[in-house]
Structures are given as structure tokens and as C-alpha cells.
UniProtKB/Swiss-Prot annotation:
It comes from Mus musculus (Mouse). CDD domains: IgV_H. One of its GO terms (biological process) is immunoglobulin mediated immune response. Keywords: Adaptive immunity, Disulfide bond, Immunity, Immunoglobulin. This is Ig heavy chain V-III region E109.
Length: 113
């Protein structure tokens, strides 16, 4: 059974920082690109960050709205992906999900700024 479990959300003041984590199981994590997406009433579903494989030197890509503020990383030995979020803004509020190329999804973690 594939599982993705996010954690680390909560309430933070504007300008603050927060780190989200996602632990995966049930598939070979190191073989999958990983993404963070978020959902809010205002913007709907919004892709925010992607990290590729070791063979791609863990290349990362970001939505313009978070570039320079958010950093995605992964630890294949722990089947985990992370999202460090700095200088948070009200518009970053939403449920944040980790996903493997949109095939598998976690339950999400709510970030409120």
C-alpha cells in the first residue's frame, strides 16, 4: 500500500518560517520525482516545487510565487521529502500536499499564515 504522510503544518506569522516533511512508503521512493502542491480557496490547486532524482543531481524547480523563499529537498535513505518555507505570506495559506508526479498523494498538512 502506497502511503505519503505530511507533517509540520500549523499557524505562523507573516514573515515567519516553517518546514514541512513527507514520509513515503509502499514504493521505491528514490525512483520518483517528488512535488509539493497546495490547495486554497483563492487559487485552487497550485503546484509549488519539484525535486528530481539523484541521477539528475536532485534538480529542483519552483513556481514563481515561491522562488527564493521555499526550498525543496529529499532524503532517499529515509524516503522523505521536505519543504523549507521562509518569509511566509498570507497567500501561502492552504493545505500542502506531497505527491509523486501526481500519481500518489498524501492527506495534506494545513499551513495558515
Amino acid at each position: 500500500e502506497v502511503k505519503l504522510e505530511e507533517s509540520g503544518g500549523g499557524l505562523v506569522q507573516p514573515g515567519g518560517s516553517m518546514k514541512l516533511s513527507c514520509v513515503a512508503s509502499g514504493f521505491t521512493f528514490s525512483n520518483y520525482w517528488m512535488n509539493w502542491v497546495r490547495q486554497s480557496p483563492e487559487k485552487g490547486l497550485e503546484w509549488i516545487a519539484e525535486i528530481r532524482l539523484k541521477s539528475h543531481n536532485y534538480a529542483t524547480h519552483y513556481a514563481e510565487s515561491v522562488k527564493g523563499r521555499f526550498t525543496i529537498s529529499r532524503d532517499d535513505s529515509k524516503s522523505s521529502v521536505f519543504l523549507q518555507m521562509n518569509n511566509l505570506r498570507a497567500e501561502d495559506t492552504g493545505i500542502h500536499y506531497c505527491t509523486t508526479g501526481f500519481a500518489y498523494w498524501g492527506q495534506g498538512t494545513l499551513v495558515t499564515v
